């Protein structure tokens, strides 16, 4: 049962309880992961089964033209989002005659881990594949335990044809160090079970990985103009995807809060598969009635939700007060699912029953950068020579001194 709280002190106490819950540590499974890695290294490391060209071709025959069209539209939409956000090489020419800049270039080979259980498996693949494609990664590898025609077609639409049937820790090990006839990758992205996420953390010094999200909490601010059924579905959708994350609604209208709770209860009664969602909202869901929505900005910044929905007539005044939310969805008609495809919010999520894991993509997963500096004929600044002298760095001091003598000559 979704709880309703009206007392300010109780609201703060409950928000703190939800916010300060211990984050599951990867260390309890790390010993198992290390053992699995060592076992894999001791084996011959034969390549796992690879999806054949015939299977790839046949996948197109098994899906409808309508589904193919939707996949292509999703790919095009994601590229339109990603391309303007691509970091660009920057070069500046200060008046002192130096040249300074930063250059970006893609990794050569990237690996995508896809766990096709419950959750948005197709969306996870599209977000990984299109970001890497837009960046310009030449070689893209997909590993997954189970495949469907839809997944195979989506992969090919993004130029991914190297697909292996592999899962778990061995799949992460294979991507990291390679196997017979399989080259290692430079980056690994994708959400998986806790063992997979721990394995990615373990190899993060060898390859680049996406950022593991400890908990993807949701907070909704809604005024009296908000639609109660929409808000109920926002909370339900979040609990369905992230059953171990909190879903909190703050509103200044008691009637709206009661309507949301009634809608949630009705949905859970009507949907047979909603048992995990119902339990998630009972443990981590909350509807709180506040006196003033405008004063909630300090709560948002204290409890820093990953996702913030502003279902308000004038949401932009609240946006200016928010400093610690990763994703902000503005207005009554901006549910967070739109962010996956229309704003570049790149959460990757997999869920199995009451357990969910998530990670966050970013351009750095597929990009390398180099700092550029042409110092010209300028002598080093005196403070730099003093700085290295104080630390006894004699070789550096001598090298800087040579630059000064060249300028004098």
Swiss-Prot record:
One of its GO terms (biological process) is L-histidine biosynthetic process. GO terms for molecular function: histidinol dehydrogenase activity; metal ion binding; NAD binding. InterPro entries: Ald_DH/histidinol_DH, Histidinol_DH_monofunct, Hstdl_DH. Its EC number is 1.1.-.-. SUPFAM superfamilies: ALDH-like. Keywords: Oxidoreductase. This is Histidinol dehydrogenase homolog. The lineage of its organism: Bacteria, Bacillati, Cyanobacteriota, Cyanophyceae, Synechococcales.
